[in-house]
Curated annotation (Swiss-Prot):
Induction: Expression is not affected by carbon nor nitrogen starvation. Expression is induced during Bionectria ochroleuca self interaction.
Family label: Belongs to the cerato-ulmin hydrophobin family.
Organism: Bionectria ochroleuca (Gliocladium roseum)
Disruption phenotype: Leads to increased growth rates, conidiation and enhanced tolerances of conidia to abiotic stresses. Reduces Arabisopsis thaliana root colonization ability.
Disulfide bridge positions per record: 31-79, 40-70, 41-53
Annotated signal peptide: 1-18
Function text: Aerial growth, conidiation, and dispersal of filamentous fungi in the environment rely upon a capability of their secreting small amphipathic proteins called hydrophobins (HPBs) with low sequence identity. Class I can self-assemble into an outermost layer of rodlet bundles on aerial cell surfaces, conferring cellular hydrophobicity that supports fungal growth, development and dispersal; whereas Class II form highly ordered films at water-air interfaces through intermolecular interactions but contribute nothing to the rodlet structure.
Location of this chain's protein in the cell: Secreted; Secreted, Cell wall
Protein name (Swiss-Prot/TrEMBL): Class II hydrophobin 3
Amino acid sequence: MRIDILATAALLAQLASASPAPAKRQTYIACSGLYGTAQCCATDVLGLVNLDCGNPPSLPTSPDEFSSVCSAIGQRARCCVLPIVSFMRLIIQDYPISY
């Protein structure tokens, strides 16, 4: 009887140690490459220039959250190439990067 209990305990311990570790999630990067600056912008001029832009108030963890964070302050999520001055961004991409 003791051998059965010890064998069962040893088997359970071995199974528990063999289970895979939880996978780490990759950090979401809203904008990358040429369009590397994540911004919340209010005014779009011909899809080339956005006015009244600023950094998102919180770090987004998904494309939907990036859009909702900017929407919450009355602006739209944009990925920009070149900051010209603090209130204007040049050459934008309409949508943040998805998974």
